[in-house]
A protein has these predicted regions:
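Terminal, non-globular segments
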Residues: 1-177
Length: 177
């Protein structure tokens, strides 16, 4: 999963933006992260969130002179909140069939713009300038609309891949000593 997240981060840098959605990007990384949040136990989810946020910042934050608008590591916190929300639905993901997986995929797609809105809010706060236009709205909501179409297919692909390699998400059992 970690390799898929890294390759997806690289891949989505080269996907052209959607012109008819005013330059909205196609984002696969949140779908991979949210699937991992459903399939893995909490310690692995935290590692996945940390690496996803760190790699996202390292690949997307411009390194220039002057005061940075966005500090490396901020995306870790931004991804942590929706990942923990999704992780709360893990028992439903484990016990139910494909219909629950589809609903959870759409919930993950709805949470995708949250990450972009949080990034925009942090940058605007650092710059002390809250400029809002239709282009900005589309660049925040557009990836969510795209994710509503792509995330179920990403979940289906990852479910098939997990069955192929023999990984079955199981409920965590607490051991009493």
């Amino acid at each position: 999963m970690i390799l898929l997240v890294f390759l997806s981060l690289i891949f989505q840098l080269y996907i052209p933006p959607m012109i008819f959605l005013k330059g909205a990007a196609i984002l696969f990384v949140p779908a991979l992260l949210f699937y991992g949040s459903l399939a893995f136990p909490l310690p692995l989810v935290l590692v996945l969130v940390f690496l996803t946020g760190l790699w996202n910042d390292l690949l997307t934050i411009p390194r220039g002179s002057g005061h940075p608008d966005y500090v490396i590591g901020t995306s870790i916190i931004i991804y942590l909140i929706p990942a923990m929300i999704i992780h709360g639905f893990r028992p439903l993901f484990i016990k139910k069939g494909w219909a629950a997986h589809l609903v959870l995929a759409e919930l993950a797609a709805i949470l995708t713009p949250f990450c972009l809105l949080a990034q925009y809010a942090i940058i605007s706060f650092e710059r002390s300038d809250f400029f809002f236009s239709d282009v900005i709205v589309w660049r925040i909501l557009g990836p969510g609309l795209i994710a509503m179409v792509t995330t179920p297919f990403v979940f289906l692909f990852l479910s098939s891949l997990s069955h192929l390699v023999g990984f079955r998400p199981r409920a965590e059992v607490a051991k009493l000593s």
